[in-house]
Amino acid sequence: MEFNGTEISTDAQGYLTHLQDWSEALAGEIARREGITLSEAHWQVIHFVRAFYLQYNTSPAVRMLVKAMAQAYGEEKGNSRYLFRLFPEGPAKQATKIAGLPKPVKCL
């Protein structure tokens, strides 16, 4: 993937292969390619999954993401309907991709 004149290494599905390549600007480009216009709600989830990864060294699958979001932000944001509205192709799949993280293990 080329971004700002630099080749960024990704796997076959477009996930970054090097976490240190991530930036908010690159996240915006990945989101654009995913057909998502990032809002403050998207950024909250993106920063949440990055913090989750740094703490647990794993990208959260949907069930884990919903549970952790509910604990952190309450049931309004910690439910799959809310997350799927933000990331229609799958909150774990798209949020982790935009956040520059590896694809969750239990993600199809």
From Swiss-Prot:
<dbReference type="GO" id="GO:0002143">
    <property type="term" value="P:tRNA wobble position uridine thiolation"/>
</dbReference>
<dbReference type="InterPro" id="IPR043163">
    <property type="entry name" value="DsrC-like_N"/>
</dbReference>
<dbReference type="InterPro" id="IPR025526">
    <property type="entry name" value="DsrC-like_dom_sf"/>
</dbReference>
<dbReference type="GO" id="GO:0016740">
    <property type="term" value="F:transferase activity"/>
</dbReference>
<comment type="function">
    <text>Part of a sulfur-relay system required for 2-thiolation of 5-methylaminomethyl-2-thiouridine (mnm(5)s(2)U) at tRNA wobble positions. Could accept sulfur from TusD.</text>
</comment>
<keyword id="KW-0963">Cytoplasm</keyword>
<dbReference type="Pfam" id="PF04358">
    <property type="entry name" value="DsrC"/>
</dbReference>
<dbReference type="GO" id="GO:0005737">
    <property type="term" value="C:cytoplasm"/>
</dbReference>
<dbReference type="InterPro" id="IPR007453">
    <property type="entry name" value="DsrC/TusE"/>
</dbReference>
<dbReference type="InterPro" id="IPR042072">
    <property type="entry name" value="DsrC-like_C"/>
</dbReference>
<feature type="active site" description="Cysteine persulfide intermediate">
    <location>
        <position position="107"/>
    </location>
</feature>
<keyword id="KW-0819">tRNA processing</keyword>
<comment type="subunit">
    <text>Interacts with the TusBCD complex. Interacts with MnmA.</text>
</comment>
<comment type="similarity">
    <text>Belongs to the DsrC/TusE family.</text>
</comment>
<dbReference type="GO" id="GO:0097163">
    <property type="term" value="F:sulfur carrier activity"/>
</dbReference>
<protein>
    <recommendedName>
        <fullName>Sulfurtransferase TusE</fullName>
        <ecNumber>2.8.1.-</ecNumber>
    </recommendedName>
</protein>
<keyword id="KW-0808">Transferase</keyword>
